[in-house]
């Protein structure tokens, strides 16, 4: 009897007992049966998968076509199963425990192979993405380097000569040089790609020849290759870790370099300020030296004048007392004479003024007489 017959017997017997069981027991029975059905469904799917691997597709299609029967035959078969169930027959066809264990082990091996294959694909995708990220980092560094070179070689030189023909020519020359450099890199990469394709064709032809000769790889070779692949993967992982550490060290080095650059920039600013201050101090020192020289010259002149005055003072001799008295008396007489002549001058001026007044009166009277006197007398 097949599994369908056993299921029909169980369902019929359960259907007869359903009228006698309470609702709580029925719910528990339904839950237990649903759990058992899920386990049986999983087991059936595993068996079908294994059966689909073993049986060819054409034979499987014919077997499925043989299953198609009419509704009448199906009803007769169902009634026959019920009668057999009522008769107490409980023959079921199924797999033994050893066969089930073999199927489970085979399914476990297939699952492990799938996991290994998925892991290899994931590692390959991870390496591919890491290569893309590394290529992007290299490209970004190249772009930053190109920008830095452009700013250093072009922008700083043409910023002082805006609008000039020389600046435009320099920019065009820089663009032409960059295009020529990219063309050279493209040619090199094309040649490298062609050589790699040739090597790939050679390796494929060698592998094809080995397969034709019968030197194809066996299980032992595959195991050896798996071991070598695992070793290479460990080496690649170690190198990737080392690369990550180097990248971290490079990042730290860049941070330290930026810090030292900032310190150098500040030191250069301080150096420029100190240079300016030194120039100002030198100018002030030059002025002070000039003033010092002028003060030395003035001091030398004052010293010479002082020596001269001291010499004159040393050579000075005071006159005698009688001579001084005589000179003083003579000076007093001269002052008296001067005062006397000053009085005489004042008297003469006053008499001159009187004479002028009298002269003016006489002159005016004479003019009046000439005006009054008639002509001809």
From Swiss-Prot:
Cross-referenced InterPro entries: CC_domain-Cilium_Assoc, CCDC113/CCDC96_CC
Location of this chain's protein in the cell: Cytoplasm, Cytoskeleton, Microtubule organizing center, Centrosome, Centriolar satellite; Cell projection, Cilium
Keywords, in A-Z order: Cell projection, Cilium biogenesis/degradation, Coiled coil, Cytoplasm, Cytoskeleton
Stretches assigned to coiled coil: 95-139, 169-355
Any single biological process term in GO: cilium assembly
Primary localisation category: cytoplasm
Cellular component terms per the entry's GO annotation: centriolar satellite; ciliary basal body; cytoplasm; protein-containing complex
Quaternary structure note: Forms a complex with CFAP184; the interaction is required for functional activity in cilia. Interacts with HAP1 and PCM1.
Family membership noted in the UniProt record: Belongs to the CFAP263 family.
Function: Component of centriolar satellites contributing to primary cilium formation. In complex with CFAP263, acts as a regulator of ciliary beating that connects radial spoke 3 (RS3) to the inner dynein arm (IDA) and the nexin-dynein regulatory complex (N-DRC). The complex is positioned parallel to N-DRC and forms a connection between the arch at the base of RS3, the IDA tail and N-DRC.
Protein name (database record): Cilia- and flagella-associated protein 263
Organism name: Mus musculus (Mouse)
Lineage: Eukaryota, Metazoa, Chordata, Craniata, Vertebrata
């Amino acid at each position: 009897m097949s599994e369908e017959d056993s299921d029909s017997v169980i369902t019929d017997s359960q259907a007869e007992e359903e009228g006698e069981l309470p609702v709580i027991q029925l719910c528990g029975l339904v839950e237990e049966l649903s759990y058992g059905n899920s386990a049986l469904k999983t087991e059936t799917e595993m068996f079908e998968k294994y059966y689909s691997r073993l049986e060819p597709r054409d034979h499987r299609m014919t077997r499925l076509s043989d299953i198609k029967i009419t509704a009448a035959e199906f009803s007769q078969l169902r009634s026959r199963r019920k009668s057999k169930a009522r008769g107490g027959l409980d023959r079921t066809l199924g797999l033994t425990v050893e066969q089930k264990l073999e199927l489970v082990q085979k399914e476990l091996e297939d699952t492990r192979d799938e996991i290994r294959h998925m892991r290899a694909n994931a590692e390959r995708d991870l390496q591919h993405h890491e290569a893309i990220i590394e290529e992007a980092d290299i490209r970004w560094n190249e772009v930053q380097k190109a920008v830095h070179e452009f700013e250093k070689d072009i922008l700083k030189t043409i910023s002082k000569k805006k609008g000039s023909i020389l600046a435009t020519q320099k920019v065009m020359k820089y663009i032409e040089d960059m295009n020529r450099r990219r063309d050279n890199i493209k040619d090199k990469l094309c040649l490298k790609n062609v050589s790699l394709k040739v090597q790939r064709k050679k390796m494929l032809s060698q592998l094809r020849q080995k397969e034709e000769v019968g030197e194809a790889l066996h299980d032992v070779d595959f195991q050896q290759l798996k071991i070598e692949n695992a070793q290479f993967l460990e080496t690649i992982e170690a190198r990737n870790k080392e690369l990550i550490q180097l990248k971290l060290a490079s990042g730290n080095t860049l941070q330290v370099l930026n810090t030292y650059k900032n310190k150098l920039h500040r030191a250069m600013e301080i150096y420029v300020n100190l240079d300016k201050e030194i120039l100002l101090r030198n100018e002030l020192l030059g002025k002070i030296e000039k003033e010092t020289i002028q003060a030395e010259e003035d001091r030398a002149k004052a010293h010479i004048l002082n020596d001269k005055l001291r010499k004159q003072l040393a050579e000075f001799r005071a006159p005698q007392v009688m001579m001084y008295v005589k000179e003083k008396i003579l000076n007093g007489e001269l002052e008296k004479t001067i005062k006397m002549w000053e009085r005489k001058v004042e008297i003469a001026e006053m008499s001159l003024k009187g004479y002028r007044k009298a002269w003016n009166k006489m002159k005016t009277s004479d003019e009046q007489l000439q005006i009054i006197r008639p002509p001809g007398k």
